[in-house]
Every structure is written in structure tokens, then in C-alpha cells.
From Swiss-Prot:
Official protein name in the record: Apoptosis regulator Bcl-2
Organism: Cricetulus griseus
Binding partners and assembly: Forms homodimers, and heterodimers with BAX, BAD, BAK and Bcl-X(L). Heterodimerization with BAX requires intact BH1 and BH2 motifs, and is necessary for anti-apoptotic activity. Component of the complex, at least composed of LRPPRC, BECN1 and BCL2; the interactions prevent BECN1 from forming an autophagy-inducing complex with PIK3C3. Interacts with EI24. Also interacts with APAF1, BBC3, BCL2L1, BNIPL, MRPL41 and TP53BP2. Binding to FKBP8 seems to target BCL2 to the mitochondria and probably interferes with the binding of BCL2 to its targets. Interacts with BAG1 in an ATP-dependent manner.
Entry-linked InterPro entries: Apop_reg_Bcl2 (IPR013278), Bcl-2-like_sf (IPR036834), Bcl-2_BH1-3 (IPR046371), Bcl-2_fam (IPR026298), Bcl2-like (IPR002475), Bcl2/BclX (IPR004725), Bcl2_BH1_motif_CS (IPR020717), Bcl2_BH2_motif_CS (IPR020726)
GO function terms (MF aspect): BH3 domain binding; channel activity; channel inhibitor activity; DNA-binding transcription factor binding; identical protein binding; molecular adaptor activity; protease binding; protein heterodimerization activity
Modification after translation, per record: Phosphorylation/dephosphorylation on Ser-70 regulates anti-apoptotic activity. Growth factor-stimulated phosphorylation on Ser-70 by PKC is required for the anti-apoptosis activity and occurs during the G2/M phase of the cell cycle. In the absence of growth factors, BCL2 appears to be phosphorylated by other protein kinases such as ERKs and stress-activated kinases. Phosphorylated by MAPK8/JNK1 at Thr-69, Ser-70 and Ser-84, which stimulates starvation-induced autophagy. Dephosphorylated by protein phosphatase 2A (PP2A).
Motif (BH1): 133-152
BH3 (motif): residue ranges: 90-104
Keyword list, A-Z: Apoptosis, Autophagy, Cytoplasm, Endoplasmic reticulum, Membrane, Mitochondrion, Mitochondrion outer membrane, Nucleus, Phosphoprotein, Transmembrane, Transmembrane helix, Ubl conjugation
Lineage of producing organism: Eukaryota, Metazoa, Chordata, Craniata, Vertebrata
Sites of Phosphothreonine modification: 69
Length: 236
């Protein structure tokens, strides 16, 4: 596989296509448009639901409420360094890893979905609290996969609760977090190419992932207006 160089691949593309995949598994068709046509390093372009599941669309006044009530800083679109297109095998390997993870912890994810209590006012705070806890003790590939699965759960739950505009916000927050907090670790550990080489279909089954042999604490506790997700404990 061709190396992407120090700058790596476009995290925005990885996020958008992963969310599209997770929503399509539930029968929701989220059209992300031509991801590759957007300026590399820019903020994600909003997606469009070709099948709009909500009978009462979220009022426009609420669509930006999550961003305004979040402890995270708003993302600013920039024209950063040139990034390499993401090879299809990266998307495929990440999808397989996410599916394997969700199968192993199906009951936990179902419980998490029922306790998220997402609203346009709370969504970004929920996201920030969970992600902070997830990476509190460090980064590894297992936690990165869990990060993508959690984002997918939030998107599906948003559509289920007739708040589909939140999906675009969640994609933005995920891209922002990857760029600001995970990109350096990913590059220092061989980039997404290393992820594929370590855990791709031609190497070993996903069920043999050492970081999926988790002593998992996937518990949700509501404390006031915040939600805490126990860290997915894993090892590289």
C-alpha cells in the first residue's frame, strides 16, 4: 500500500464514510456527496438524507444549539497540508473492526443508546464527556475503533429520535477530535496503513484482536446533565 507520508489521510473522509456506513446498516441513506471533491483539510460538508425518517423535523433554531452548549471549541475550516486520498482498504478494515466490536458488546451498546437521552441542547456535551473518558488513560487502536462506534451510535440514535440534523454536527465533532487529539498518535504509530497491516483481513481474524480482549467497563451513569462512559480498556 502506498504510504501517505507524514501528513496522513483525510480524517474527514474517514469519518463521513464511516457514519454513512453505520446509518445504512439501519436503513438510513445519508448522502455525503463527493467527499473527495472538497478541499482537503476542510471541515466536513453537511450530508443529506435521501430518506428523511423524521415526521417533525428539528426546528432550525435548535440545529446549532448543541454546538453553542458544548465545552469543545467550534471547528474552523482551514486549508491545511495536502492529505492523501484514503484507500478503500482503510474504510473496509475500520468497518469490519467496528462491526466486530459492536457484536461483542451488543448489549452494552443497546443500553448506551437507551441512556444517551440526546437532545439538540445536550448532544455535544454528551459527546465531549464520553470521548474525554474514553481516551483519559491514553490512546490505542481499540479505543479509536470504540470512538468511531460511539459516534455511529450517536448518529443512529439521533435519527431514531427524529433529530437527523445532529448527524452533521456529530461528523464535525468527530473530525475535529481526530485532527486535534488523535492525528499525531495515529501518525506516530504508522498511520492508518499500520492499522490495516496489523488487523486487515489478510493478516488475522478480527476476533483475534488483542485490544478487543477487553476488560471492558462500558457503563453509563447520568450525573446531573452529564453522562459518563466507562473507558474501553484495551491494549495495542
Amino acid at each position: 500500500m502506498a504510504q501517505a507520508g507524514r501528513t496522513g489521510y483525510d480524517n474527514r473522509e474517514i469519518v463521513m464514510k464511516y457514519i454513512h456506513y453505520k446509518l445504512s446498516q439501519r436503513g438510513y441513506e445519508w448522502d455525503v456527496g463527493d467527499v473527495d471533491a472538497a478541499p482537503l483539510g476542510a471541515a466536513p460538508t453537511p450530508g443529506i438524507f435521501s430518506f428523511q425518517p423524521e415526521s417533525n423535523p428539528t426546528p432550525a433554531v435548535h440545529r446549532d444549539m448543541a454546538a453553542r452548549t458544548s465545552p469543545l471549541r467550534p471547528i474552523v475550516a482551514t486549508t491545511g497540508p495536502t492529505l492523501s486520498p484514503v484507500p478503500p482498504v482503510v474504510h473496509l478494515t475500520l468497518r469490519r473492526a467496528g462491526d466486530d466490536f459492536s457484536r461483542r458488546y451488543r448489549r452494552d451498546f443497546a443500553e448506551m443508546s437507551s441512556q444517551l437521552h440526546l437532545t439538540p441542547f445536550t448532544a455535544r456535551g454528551r459527546f465531549a464527556t464520553v470521548v474525554e473518558e474514553l481516551f483519559r488513560d491514553g490512546v490505542n487502536w481499540g479505543r479509536i475503533v470504540a470512538f468511531f462506534e460511539f459516534g455511529g451510535v450517536m448518529c443512529v440514535e439521533s435519527v431514531n429520535r427524529e433529530m437527523s440534523p445532529l448527524v452533521d454536527n456529530i461528523a464535525l465533532w468527530m473530525t475535529e477530535y481526530l485532527n486535534r487529539h488523535l492525528h499525531t498518535w495515529i501518525q506516530d504509530n504508522g498511520g492508518w496503513d499500520a492499522f490495516v497491516e496489523l488487523y486487515g483481513p489478510s493478516v488475522r481474524p478480527l476476533f483475534d484482536f488483542s485490544w478487543l480482549s477487553l476488560k471492558t467497563l462500558l457503563s453509563l451513569a447520568l450525573v446531573g446533565a452529564c453522562i459518563t462512559l466507562g473507558t474501553y480498556l484495551g491494549h495495542k
